[in-house]
Amino acid sequence: MTDWSAVLTGFVVILVLGLVGLVVPGIGQLAAGLLGGLVAGYLAGGGLARGFWHGLLAGAFGGILLGAILFVLLTVAGFLVGPIGGVFGGLAGTSAFVIAVTLAAIAAIDSAVGGAVGGLLA
């Protein structure tokens, strides 16, 4: 079972450290992802795999939200055009969601590694 409080806490850590990394050189986005994933994995506990999963979700959370929003917008826009537009809007929305989630998961690999370490430390 996913511990969403751990995922959201890790996401907030990534967000805050990412913003700090824009202003203060040396911290960077990679460190933000690693530390946010570490926090998510540590809070979730349960070992390597559970920490990896929670770190991955924390790192990919923004992309997953974007994909869900694109899915809804494209599907609704398609239905506004008509029945055929609804079919194409649904296909476009589903495609956008799958692409966004896939890219978010790839970009969140550093967070997943941090989460695995955090899961081991917990």
Predicted regions and their residues:
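Juxtamembrane/disordered regions of integral membrane proteins
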Residues: 1-58, 64-122
